[in-house]
Regions:
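Conserved beta-strand-loop-alpha-helix junction that forms the acyl-donor binding cleft
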Residues: 127-138
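Conserved acetyl-CoA-binding loop of GNAT-fold acetyltransferases
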Residues: 142-152
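Conserved N-terminal entry element of GNAT/NAT acetyltransferase domains
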Residues: 1-19, 160-161
Length: 161
């Protein structure tokens, strides 16, 4: 595939299906090896049901697939959470794109659809959680579409048996 952008009409954005497990696993496994994102296959498998659409929850996993081949090329999880101040905040989590499609606009197409959905759910803002030592390039990319850093989150990991 050459360096040109993928057109929106060449992509299908849809809900995650159980048949997407292997394709999404491969995308995340590659990210894990490159960026150590905390991906653990057994936990991904155990939480498969969380990626399924549930009408009573404001949480879904979106899939971007090529219309021509059906190849899954990107995924992203979105969720609306009511804050303790009473406002809904949308979150984009576990955003990942197949290596050969990075920089071709697929992630933006997927994120645009996700933000439309979050807005329709009544969200007043959308947040993206990134690693503190995240790639400066990603911050610049998100900045081009209106995202800016607003908070710092501190985390303490618990030891597991």
């Amino acid at each position: 595939m050459s360096g040109e952008l993928i057109k929106e009409e060449d992509i299908i954005i849809r809900n995650y299906r159980t048949s997407d497990y292997q394709a999404t696993f491969q995308i995340l496994k590659e990210l894990q090896s490159k960026y150590n994102i905390g991906f653990v296959e057994s936990k991904w498998r155990e939480t498969s049901g969380l990626r399924q659409f549930k009408p009573n929850l404001k949480r879904i996993t979106l899939i971007a697939e090529l219309k021509s081949t059906g190849q899954v090329v990107s995924l992203g999880m979105l969720e609306a959470v009511k804050s303790n101040l009473g406002q809904y905040i949308g979150y984009l989590n576990n955003w990942a794109t197949e290596k050969e499609f990075i920089g071709k606009g697929v992630g933006k197409i997927l994120a645009d659809r996700a933000t439309q959905i979050l807005k329709s759910w009544g969200c007043e803002a959308v947040r993206i959680n990134m690693a503190y030592r995240g790639d400066k390039k990603l911050i610049d990319i998100f900045g081009k579409v209106g995202f800016e850093p607003i908070i710092t989150v501190l985390e303490k990991k618990f030891e597991t048996d």
